């Protein structure tokens, strides 16, 4: 099928990637980088002809209407005082990810970047990060979504929406 683009998403891209991995990427129509923002500039310089996009980005964690330390960027914070909640200020994230604001700013500021797919639109049952793999954890939800399991938007939902709608369309 020569009519459709072929792509892959991978989290191993860096300026030092070698071998079969690079050969495979070179034959793709578009190269997806999972959480590759830190390596993007070096990969772009090494491969200026690649169409590159963020195939999995952000991994911010949040609980709707729960707020912690707005001046701090918190990552993988699972201390007991959190009561199994993540901050809806947009300042909680996993160690390998970025906040929604950081991911969106990165995308906006790089003309050669073809866009991004955030992880994830909706919360889901499983991967209760940052509490997964801990015994006796009552948490089931993933925290990653910009919409929770009840279908209600979290604050970052409005950040993303504001980038696509004008004030006249959605005042």
Regions found by a protein language model. Give the residues of each.
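Extended substrate-binding grooves/exosites of carbohydrate-active enzymes
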Residues: 1-171
